[in-house]
C-alpha cells in the first residue's frame, strides 16, 4: 500500500464515459494508495465507489438540487482549498473544471494532474480562451489525454507535452451486464435495429441521426427501429422532430439507463454522431458486444478506435446524407459489415484494462 494521499476532483458525476472511467480508475487506485478522497457534489453516486474511498461533498442538501455547473465547481473549489490548507502531501487528479482546479492547487503549491476528456476543437474557440488555457495548463505537473489524436491536438494548438493513456476497458463487466434480462419489445427480428447512447446535447448531435433515418424512411422500403438512450436539454426537440415526420413507430427515445448493455446487445448497429469527443467509451462497449459501429469522423477518438475505417463505418461529421449512405451500406453488405466488426473487436487489445490502469498508478506514485 503506497503512502501518498490522492485527491480526485470531479464536481459533477453523471452517467457518461468520463464517469465510467472515473469509477474504474478511483476504485483501482483505492487498492494501492493509503488514502483516496473524492470531491464532488454528486452524493448519489457515492455507492459506486469502494467503501475505503473518502467522499467529500457539501453538507447542505441545497447543492443536490442546484443544476448550475459553475456554482457546483465553485463550492467544490472551496472544499478543495480546505483540504489543501489542512492536509499535506496531497496529489490532486482533476477530471473536471481542470483550469480552476489547477489554479487552486498551484496557489497552495500542491501537485496536480489534469485528465483532459474532450477534444480541444470542441471548446477552445476564441483567441483569448486559447491563451488563458495554455498559460494555466503549463502550471500542471502532468496532463493526461486518452487518444493519440488528442495528444497531437495539444502539441499543435498549445505546444504542450501530454501523457497518453487509453481508457481502461473492462470487457468482462460489459459482457456480464449485457446478459441481464430486460422487458423490451421494441426491436423486431424482421427489422434493421440501431441504437445511439449518449447525453441529449448539441455535442452528441442526435438530430443528425434522425434526419438520416427520415431519408431512409422516405427513399427506401427498409424496415428499421432506432433506439436513442439518454437524457438532456435536447430531448423535447428530438421528440418534436420524430412526431412531425411521423417516425413514432420506428424511433424511440428513452431516458438514461444505468445499465444500457442489454439494449446494446439486442441491436444490430451502434451510431455515434458527435461533433467532438475525447475517446468515446461507448464505441469500445459496442465493439465489445460485437456490434457494427457507424461513427462520425469527429475529433478525437472514433477514427483511432475504428482503425480509420477498418473496424467500422465512418461518415463525414454533420453530414446526414453520408450517414444515410453508411446505413444503406450496412443493410446491403452483411458479410463486409461482419468483417469490419471482427477487425474492430480484435483491435480492442489496445485498451487493456490492467495495463492502462497501471499507467495511472505510475504517474500518481512518481
Q: Where are each of the predicted segments found?
A:
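A conserved mid-protein helix/loop that constitutes part of the nucleotide-sugar donor-binding site
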Residues: 16-24, 192, 196-217, 233-239, ...
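Carbohydrate-associated surface elements
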Residues: 149, 168
Amino acid at each position: 500500500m503506497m503512502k501518498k494521499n490522492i485527491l480526485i476532483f470531479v464536481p459533477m458525476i453523471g452517467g457518461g464515459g468520463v464517469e465510467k472511467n472515473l469509477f474504474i480508475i478511483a476504485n483501482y487506485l483505492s487498492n494501492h494508495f493509503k488514502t483516496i478522497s473524492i470531491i464532488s457534489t454528486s452524493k448519489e453516486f457515492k455507492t459506486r465507489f469502494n467503501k475505503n474511498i473518502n467522499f467529500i461533498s457539501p453538507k447542505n442538501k441545497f447543492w443536490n438540487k442546484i443544476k448550475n455547473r459553475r456554482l457546483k465547481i465553485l463550492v467544490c473549489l472551496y472544499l478543495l482549498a480546505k483540504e489543501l490548507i489542512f492536509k499535506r502531501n496531497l496529489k490532486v487528479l482533476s477530471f473536471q473544471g481542470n483550469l480552476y482546479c489547477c489554479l487552486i492547487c498551484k496557489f497552495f503549491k500542491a501537485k496536480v494532474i489534469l485528465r483532459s476528456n474532450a477534444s480541444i476543437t470542441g471548446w477552445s474557440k476564441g483567441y483569448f480562451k486559447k491563451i488563458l488555457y495554455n498559460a494555466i495548463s503549463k502550471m500542471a505537473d502532468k496532463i493526461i489525454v486518452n487518444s493519440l489524436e488528442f495528444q497531437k491536438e495539444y502539441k499543435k494548438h498549445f505546444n504542450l507535452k501530454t501523457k497518453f493513456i487509453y481508457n481502461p476497458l473492462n470487457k468482462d463487466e460489459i459482457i456480464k451486464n449485457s446478459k441481464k434480462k430486460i422487458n423490451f419489445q421494441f426491436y423486431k427480428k424482421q427489422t434493421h435495429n440501431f441504437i445511439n447512447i449518449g447525453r441529449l446535447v448539441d455535442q452528441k448531435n442526435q438530430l443528425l441521426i434522425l434526419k438520416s433515418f427520415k431519408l431512409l424512411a422516405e427513399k427506401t422500403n427498409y424496415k428499421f427501429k432506432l433506439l436513442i438512450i439518454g437524457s438532456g436539454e435536447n430531448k423535447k426537440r428530438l421528440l418534436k422532430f420524430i412526431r412531425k415526420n411521423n417516425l413514432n413507430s420506428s424511433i424511440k427515445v428513452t431516458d438514461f439507463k444505468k445499465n444500457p448493455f442489454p439494449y446494446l446487445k439486442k441491436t444490430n448497429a451502434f451510431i455515434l454522431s458527435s461533433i467532438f469527443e475525447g475517446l468515446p467509451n461507448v464505441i469500445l462497449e459496442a465493439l465489445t458486444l460485437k456490434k457494427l459501429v457507424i461513427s462520425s469522423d469527429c475529433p478525437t477518438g472514433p477514427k483511432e478506435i475504428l482503425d480509420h475505417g477498418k473496424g467500422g463505418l465512418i461518415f463525414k461529421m454533420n453530414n446526414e446524407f453520408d450517414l444515410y449512405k453508411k446505413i444503406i451500406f450496412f443493410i446491403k453488405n452483411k458479410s463486409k459489415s461482419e468483417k469490419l466488426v471482427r477487425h474492430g473487436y480484435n483491435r480492442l487489445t489496445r485498451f487493456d484494462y490492467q495495463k492502462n490502469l497501471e499507467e495511472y498508478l505510475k504517474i500518481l506514485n512518481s
